[in-house]
């Protein structure tokens, strides 16, 4: 991974120009701990229909899309990052962090730029962040799952050619 950003949920269809603008307003993750970045797309759930006469599959019905997930651990982070991604609140301005009284999911847009330059965009990700032991430290582990976007015409996720976004 080259770069990671997070910010407010994206509420309009993403184009190369709007993505470049959004990146300028988003928070850039300054540190992703070694070997913690991962993008996965689960296989969809499906039902196979079998022809009794010969035992072959004659139709496959996709019943549920597979989840798309980005995970990484911030090895260095601020209390602002922790509040933004995990919830809770800062204590004594910037002296510490206090957990939320109720568990919950934080919704954010998450964008990753791959080493080849392409952008993976989750417009409305359900983010769960937690303390994550890495080496001799506690990092901020982030799991973001692409969710349906509540805004009409906005897809849950996009992928863009990095050169075209950067040139916009």
Give a label for each model feature.
Residues 1-82, 123-137:
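Solvent-exposed edge beta-strands and adjacent loop segments
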Residues 15-23, 91-100:
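Low-complexity, polar-biased intrinsically disordered regions enriched in Pro/Ser/Thr/Gly
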Residues 24, 88, 116-117, 162:
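Intrinsic-disorder/low-complexity loop/linker signature
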Residues 51-52, 114, 149:
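Acidic surface patches and DE-rich sequence motifs
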Residues 69-73, 109-111, 141-145:
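Beta-strand secondary-structure signal
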Residues 75-99:
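Charged, amphipathic alpha-helical segments
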Residues 96-131:
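Acidic-leaning, charged glycine-interspersed low-complexity segments
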Residues 117-168:
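Mixed-charge, glycine-accented linear interaction segment located at domain edges/termini
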